[in-house]
Every structure is written in structure tokens, then in C-alpha cells.
Amino acid sequence: MGSSLVSVAEQLLKDLQRTYSEIKQIPDDLLIALRFVFGPCALQALDLVDQHSVTCVSSPSGRKAFQVLGGSGRLYTCFTSCHYCPCPAFSFTVLRRNESLMCKHLLAVILSQAMGLCQQEQVSDQQMTHILSRQPEAST
């Protein structure tokens, strides 16, 4: 993807954040622009935001990760700092085919932050280690 498209996407997300903070909705022109820049995953990402599927998980040490409950019920841990999601769509359409800027999960994280609709969850440092290493936590 070209750097000019990335710049357009960044500006679009800034406009969305400003507009949503003022009127608490996304006007049609911004919805159309989202669809144009991000493709079909834009509406899917907005659906995830509407379903409150995005959670910002943070620990006392200051580590932070975002978890998105996908439509299939699978939980994806996304990282905005390095622009990564472990879902198959990210691997295929973003990394391999370079057809999209991001998957719906990563876009949902960015949109939920811009709209102030991200769920918050505090976890211990040990729990965060398990989340970041993608190891299931042992039940005790």
C-alpha cells in the first residue's frame, strides 16, 4: 500500500475522532470515506465496535494490549504499536497480498479508541504475560 493512502487513512481517522467527539455519530460522508479507504472490513469493524467487542487490557507495569472478540467467537490480541493482528485475514490480505491496510480487528481497535468506545480491563502482570505470549492461563 502506498504511503499516500496511509496518510489519507490517518487523516480520515483524525476527522472521525474529532467529528464523533462533537456529535456522537459518524456522518454518511465519513462512512463512505471509511468504506473507500478500508474496503469491506470498515463496516465489519464498525459492527465489532457496536457490539463492544474491543477491550483494552492493561497491567500495573504499564503494558497494554487490545483484545477483539471476532464474529466466530475467537479472541484476537491486536497490537496497534506494531500494526499486527494474528487473524488469518491479516496474514493473507495485509501481509501476503498487500490488498488492505489492516484487518477488521485492527481497524475495530483504532475506531473504538477514536470513538471512546473501547472497554477497559485491568489484569495482573502475570496475566498480561500470558496474554502477550498467547498461552492459555492455568485455572487455579
UniProtKB/Swiss-Prot annotation:
One GO BP: double-strand break repair via homologous recombination
Zinc finger (SWIM-type): 76-114
GO cellular component entries: nucleus; Shu complex
Main location group: nucleus
Function text: Involved in early stages of the homologous recombination repair (HRR) pathway of double-stranded DNA breaks arising during DNA replication or induced by DNA-damaging agents.
One of the record's GO molecular function terms: zinc ion binding
Lineage: superkingdom: Eukaryota
Taxonomic source organism: Danio rerio
Family: Belongs to the SWS1 family.
Keyword terms of this UniProt record: DNA damage, DNA recombination, DNA repair, Metal-binding, Nucleus, Zinc, Zinc-finger
Cross-referenced PANTHER family: ZINC FINGER SWIM DOMAIN-CONTAINING PROTEIN 7
Record's subcellular location: Nucleus
Identification of the protein by name: Zinc finger SWIM domain-containing protein 7
